[in-house]
Amino acid sequence: MATRRSKTPAPGVSLRDTLVHAGLESSLADLLAEMPHRILHVDPRRPFREPGSPRDEVMFVRSGILAKYKTDGSGRRQIVALRFAGEGILPRDASAGYGIQAIVKSEVMVGKARDFDRIVDAHPELQRFFLRLIQRNETFGYE
């Protein structure tokens, strides 16, 4: 029997709830969830951030799955990490050596690095929280 796939992403996961579930204090999760941002709807297998482009933004997956990829010598994309609903990709000071694409139709919250940095600078416990998440992600991926 054939099934129909929705043309829109699955309902988004609350960023606030995901961060609180991961161990972040609710008031800090509220600050991140209320940060100025825009929502992107991303189609599968189409890179929306190419390797080498600036990473002056923070991204949180609201629904779907994102892949961080690197291009091998033959030009094929090799997935090095996945981000699921509620997880994020943090900003960098330099260009990133990886690209980002959706695995399935996804919805992504994108904020400016300076807004994110302002919140993190004012609340040092956020640095410790994100450091723990980065260490956890490195355990599972090739980042």
Question: Which residues fall in each region the model found?
Answer:
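Cytosolic regulatory regions built on CNB/CRP/Popeye-like sensor folds
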Residues: 1-143
